[in-house]
Amino acid sequence: MQTVAVIDYGMGNLHSVAKALEHVGAGKVLITSDASVIREADRVVFPGVGAIRDCMAEIRRLGFDALVREVSQDRPFLGICVGMQALLDHSEENEGVDCIGLFPGQVKFFGKGLIEDGEHLKVPHMGWNEVKQAVDHPLWHNIADLARFYFVHSYYINAGNTRQVVGSGHYGVDFAAALADGSRFAVQFHPEKSHTHGLQLLQNFAAWDGRW
């Protein structure tokens, strides 16, 4: 049976993610902060919630920045929400925080005064929104273009390499909702909270060989 390591650095919605992975038959799901267990896993999931400064402080304290760079090179790897944002170069949250730098780009604040069709939009962006699929990636298998996923975020990703944007969203501004590079895939939305489409994405991840 394959193993899926859900990285625990104290800042993620870990049990919801693990339960969703178990629900789709992903194999043996381990919530762990043990580097050796993470290295031995067949697949790795990197969730995250909260302030990026606190997340990156814990990631660096545990040495997980180097570990994430290592394990995401040679096996299917999924970043979720702030776990996705931590993979970028830099976030302007908390007066500016350097991140892991696996994907080029910046994490930016939606800002006050966000307007769409004459209406003021609330920040954080919270609720269901469409994701426009840019390419035919294996993790989109059996998920229709413009399927709706569940988002909760005040900061959005401005990708530095548009070829890595495999899904985009719009909330006053266009933003990267999904990024991919080799065996790495990352999403701004919460698949574990996104019902049918989110579970399908996790099922696709569980079956993916990491090639694209």
Curated annotation (Swiss-Prot):
Listed under GO cellular component are: cytoplasm
CDD domains, A to Z: GATase1_IGP_Synthase (cd01748)
Which domain of life does the protein's organism represent?
Bacteria
* First and last residue of the signal peptide: none
The family database entries (PROSITE patterns) matched by this protein are listed as: GATASE_TYPE_1
> Which cysteine pairs are joined by S-S bonds?
none
Reaction catalysed by this chain?
Answer: 5-[(5-phospho-1-deoxy-D-ribulos-1-ylimino)methylamino]-1-(5-phospho-beta-D-ribosyl)imidazole-4-carboxamide + L-glutamine = D-erythro-1-(imidazol-4-yl)glycerol 3-phosphate + 5-amino-1-(5-phospho-beta-D-ribosyl)imidazole-4-carboxamide + L-glutamate + H(+); L-glutamine + H2O = L-glutamate + NH4(+)
Q: Which organism is it from?
A: Pseudomonas fluorescens (strain ATCC BAA-477 / NRRL B-23932 / Pf-5)
GO-annotated biological processes: L-histidine biosynthetic process
> Could you tell me one molecular function GO term of this UniProt entry?
glutaminase activity
Q: What does this protein do?
A: IGPS catalyzes the conversion of PRFAR and glutamine to IGP, AICAR and glutamate. The HisH subunit catalyzes the hydrolysis of glutamine to glutamate and ammonia as part of the synthesis of IGP and AICAR. The resulting ammonia molecule is channeled to the active site of HisF.
Subunit composition and interactions: Heterodimer of HisH and HisF.
Q: Which InterPro entries match?
A: Class_I_gatase-like, GATASE, Imidazole-glycPsynth_HisH
Subcellular location as annotated: Cytoplasm
Q: Which residues form the Glutamine amidotransferase type-1 domain?
A: 3-212
**Which residues constitute the catalytic centre?**
C81 (nucleophile), H190, E192
For this entry, the protein name equals Imidazole glycerol phosphate synthase subunit HisH
Q: Which UniProt keywords apply?
A: Amino-acid biosynthesis, Cytoplasm, Glutamine amidotransferase, Histidine biosynthesis, Hydrolase, Lyase
Question: Keyword Cytoplasm on this protein?
Answer: yes
Gene of this entry:
hisH
Quote the NCBIfam families the UniProt record gives. IMP_synth_hisH
In short, the EC number is 4.3.2.10, 3.5.1.2
Where this protein primarily resides, as one coarse class? cytoplasm
Q: Which Pfam families match?
A: GATase (PF00117)
User: What is its pathway?
Assistant: Amino-acid biosynthesis; L-histidine biosynthesis; L-histidine from 5-phospho-alpha-D-ribose 1-diphosphate: step 5/9
